[in-house]
Amino acid sequence: MAKKVQAYVKLQVAAGMANPSPPVGPALGQQGVNIMEFCKAFNAKTDSLEKGLPIPVVITVYADRSFTFVTKTPPAAVLLKKAAGIKSGSGKPNKDKVGKISRAQLQEIAQTKAADMTGADIEAMTRSIEGTARSMGLVVED
């Protein structure tokens, strides 16, 4: 018989840097999960990734207080900022441009995000990432 699911907890945690402080501690503490066990498992799973990169994670908490978790790819905006070498997007993306990004970089990001995105093909995913880039005030170059 399958375990009974008590809750799903969605968080963004820095890769390799999970610790019991907020937001991890309070979110998991409410569900009665062993926080240190999650932190150790998460840090072990993300140690191959760049430290500090925010990683979305969905934690499934079961009625017996055990848990499983699934890590996703970093948000597109974070990958775009890293590729363009900027700290933050534009407050007025239609007027103020903050950086430039090439189509090759967009395609690379789309391939990284492919596992978590829904799209017919890599071109459709690239166009989706391109829209995110434009809304951040990045200029897309061919």
From Swiss-Prot:
GO molecular function: large ribosomal subunit rRNA binding; structural constituent of ribosome
PROSITE patterns: RIBOSOMAL_L11 (PS00359)
An individual GO BP term: translation
Superkingdom in the source lineage: Bacteria
Family per record: Belongs to the universal ribosomal protein uL11 family.
Pfam families: Ribosomal_L11, Ribosomal_L11_N
GO-annotated cellular components: cytosolic large ribosomal subunit
NCBIfam families in UniProt: L11_bact
Signal peptide: none
Annotated protein name in UniProt: Large ribosomal subunit protein uL11
Natural source organism: Klebsiella pneumoniae subsp. pneumoniae (strain ATCC 700721 / MGH 78578)
Protein modification: One or more lysine residues are methylated.
Oligomer status and interactors: Part of the ribosomal stalk of the 50S ribosomal subunit. Interacts with L10 and the large rRNA to form the base of the stalk. L10 forms an elongated spine to which L12 dimers bind in a sequential fashion forming a multimeric L10(L12)X complex.
Keyword vocabulary terms for this entry: Methylation, Ribonucleoprotein, Ribosomal protein, RNA-binding, rRNA-binding
Record's function text: Forms part of the ribosomal stalk which helps the ribosome interact with GTP-bound translation factors.
UniProt entry tagged with the keyword rRNA-binding: yes
